[in-house]
Structures are given as structure tokens and as C-alpha cells.
Amino acid sequence: MYDVVDLTPTYSPTLKPMLSQQYQTVPPFIIPPNDPNSPSPLSSPSLLSLHQIQMHHQQQLQLLQQQQQQLQQQHQNQVVNQPIQPLQPQPSAFLLNHPNTITTPPLQPMMTPNTIISINSLPPTTTTTTTTTTTTTIPNNNNNITLSPQHHHGQQQHHQHPHLRVDISNNNNSVVDQLPQQQQTNVNNNNNNNNNNNNNNNSNNNNNNNNDFSTPNSFSVPTTPMVAPQMQFPQPPPPLSALNTPNNSTSNPTTPRNERDLLRRLAVANSNNNLNNNLNNLNNNNNNNNNNNNNNNNNNNNNSNNNNINNNNNINNNNNLNNNNLNNNNLPIIQPLNLNNNNNNNNNNNNNNNNNLINPFLNEAIDEQVVPKGSTSPLITSSKKRIKLNV
């Protein structure tokens, strides 16, 4: 009666348990037809039965459409054959709400042309509307913006249409335009007041911006970024055992010892010359600043006596030179410069003559140079006192 099916699970994806047809059921979304003559889907649940159910529904729809068309045709035939009867007048909602203002005759089954609806009195429809004007002020930094809806003199009923009007008063635009110019005039006035008061410290600070430092220790920032070059190592690096000191016997320098000493002296001399040039440039800049300050002081003190002007210039020059020496922090403070001269014209000459005294590196005098034995060139020399440098 029943088919016995082995439902033992297997690991093969191709083998699946098979069920007989009598255990299969119809999905719940399929509704069987109401016609008792049609085959039931429970008896033959197959694609053919589903197709038959769909065909049955289509036939039922066609029958319903035909019946509807027949009813419409019958209705049209009845309307054409029967005479048209006039409609009875129906009272409106206004008449029901206002029975005293409008009088109507009693309802009659048939309306005749002689029937007249008499209207005794109608209430006049008067509408009044009050509109309010509101003004809102939004404070801004420089402009006052006033928001106010327009006021309509006409009357409206239950509808308000506010129109937004923006009033911008540009009262402060002139002040805004004059701000940069006003700031500039204030700066100029401050400079004039400082010059009239002979404030030497402020004049030095103002003149420092015009200094042209051409030394390596300058305030200027390079525009192009400094990029380290890519070092190429065609050969492998030497082992740590090969990195010995020059005094070790295993080292084989490419240049003799005397030539290396000469190169070291040349390097020290070049560094001293560069330092001399830097100090000379700094002294020249200081002298230029002093001359500019003297000119400003002379122009501001035209009304005073000549003797007082000369004395003030000498005092101001000394103070300015000392202040400049203390304010220049880029170069090392070596020795106090011998620049306390009363005459401005002699500053450059004194600086050129005192270059050897400014540099402390040249204070160590080199002893008498002795030509070593076996050397034919007098340039390759040695000294009794050597300067130890980490070269």
C-alpha cells in the first residue's frame, strides 16, 4: 500500500531520497476552483493541473465580462425605450441651514415652467480682514538688515499673503573701506613720534628689518626645500674591523702626514677668513644703521644747536653699536668690538685694521716652520705646535 523509501543520509551530492507522488501536497498559494466539475488539484498535483486551473480562471473572467456587457446593453435598451422623467428638485444645504431667509414653494411631483422660487431677502456678505505688520531686525557686523512684510490696504478673507521686504542700510560701509588706510596712517604717526622723541631702541628695531644679511647665518629662509642627495654605494660597506683610527699601524692613508697637516691648516685659514668676512659684513651693516639713525636724529633736531647735535650723535652711536652687538644672536659673541669711535667716517678704517684682533682663532701664533728632512718642496712644512681638529 505504501512505498518504503530508504531515507538514510548519504554523503554523495547526487543521491537524494525519492518520495512517491501520493505524499506530495499543493502549495498554499494555489486556490482550487469552486466549480465541482473541474478536477481537483489534490488528485493530480502536476504542472498540467496548474495549467488547467489557470485556464479555468481565465474562462471565469471571460464569462463575467460577457455578463457585464449584457447587463450594460439591457440597461441602455431600457433607457432608450422608456420616456425621460424630470428630476425632483432637492433642497440645498444653504436652504436647510437658513429656512427663514429664503422661502420655497412646496415640492411638487412635476416642475412646470410657471414655477417661480421667490427670494425675499438675502443677507449681504461682508468680509473684513485685519493684517498686522511685524518688523524683525537682525543685527549684523556692519549692516542692519530689517525684515518687514508689506502691508496691504485691501481687505482679504481668511487668507494672508505676507511679502518679505529686506531693507539693508549701508551706514558702515564707508568706515569699513577706510579701515586699512586708517591703520596705515596710525603706523606712520607712530614712527614719526618715535623719531621726534629720539627713541633709539625703537629706531634700531625698525631699521633691523632693512638689514641685508649675506652671511650663512642669516634670517632669510630658502624658497626651495633642502633635499639630501641620494648617496649611491656601488661597493659593499667595509667591515667594522677595517674602521680603525689613523694612528693604527694597519691604516694606509692615501696622502702623507705632512700633506694632511697642510690641508688642515688651509681648512682652518679658510674658516677664519669666512669668519672675518662675516664680521666685516656685520660691522658694515651696523655702521649703515648708525648712519641712518644719525641722519634721522639730525633731521629731527634741526632747531637745536650744532654742538648739542654732535654730542647727541656721539652718544647715540655708542649706544646703538652696543645694542646691535647684543641683539645679533646668530653669530657667536667673540670679543667686544673696538667700535666706540666718535667719528663715523673712521669706523670702516678701524674695522679693516682690527680684523686680526677680532678673531680669537688667530691669536695662537704659529711657531717658526721647519722644513723636514728629505723634502724638496718648501711648501710641505711642519710646525712645532699643531692645532688638533676633528677633521
Swiss-Prot record:
<feature type="compositionally biased region" description="Basic residues">
    <location>
        <begin position="150"/>
        <end position="162"/>
    </location>
</feature>
<feature type="region of interest" description="Disordered">
    <location>
        <begin position="337"/>
        <end position="356"/>
    </location>
</feature>
<protein>
    <recommendedName>
        <fullName>Uncharacterized protein DDB_G0286175</fullName>
    </recommendedName>
</protein>
<feature type="compositionally biased region" description="Polar residues">
    <location>
        <begin position="212"/>
        <end position="223"/>
    </location>
</feature>
<feature type="region of interest" description="Disordered">
    <location>
        <begin position="272"/>
        <end position="327"/>
    </location>
</feature>
<feature type="compositionally biased region" description="Low complexity">
    <location>
        <begin position="118"/>
        <end position="149"/>
    </location>
</feature>
<feature type="compositionally biased region" description="Low complexity">
    <location>
        <begin position="244"/>
        <end position="256"/>
    </location>
</feature>
<feature type="compositionally biased region" description="Low complexity">
    <location>
        <begin position="186"/>
        <end position="211"/>
    </location>
</feature>
<feature type="region of interest" description="Disordered">
    <location>
        <begin position="184"/>
        <end position="258"/>
    </location>
</feature>
<feature type="region of interest" description="Disordered">
    <location>
        <begin position="118"/>
        <end position="162"/>
    </location>
</feature>
